[in-house]
């Protein structure tokens, strides 16, 4: 069953974050991940949540998403992202 990693990103260092953007895709592909949304326009429909940047990544399942997140392939890009931004990240199981 598909799983989705949903990330709210607040970029603090745009130059460093661009390094992350350039290095993350191959790590996703190695785990069957693909971007569904990556920083496009966000429009609130209800409530008070107003993320400036939102990313959604699809994986084959939750276990694979978690394996990617903790993988050695993602370790360096993750460190770059963590130093360049503040993020909230969840994984949700699809239907």
Tell where the protein language model's regions lie, with residue ranges:
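Short S/T/G/P-rich N-terminal loop/turn motif that feeds into the first structured element of a domain
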Residues: 1-70, 74, 93-95
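C-terminal end-helix/capping segment
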Residues: 82-95
């Amino acid at each position: 069953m598909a799983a989705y990693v949903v990330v709210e990103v607040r970029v603090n260092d745009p130059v460093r974050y661009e390094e992350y953007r350039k290095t993350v895709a191959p790590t996703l592909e190695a785990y069957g991940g693909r971007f569904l949304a990556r920083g496009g326009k966000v429009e609130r429909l209800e409530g008070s949540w107003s993320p400036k940047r939102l990313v959604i990544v699809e994986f084959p399942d939750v276990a694979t998403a978690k394996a990617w997140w903790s993988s050695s392939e993602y370790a360096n890009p993750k460190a770059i992202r963590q130093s360049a931004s503040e993020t909230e990240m969840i994984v949700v199981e699809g239907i």
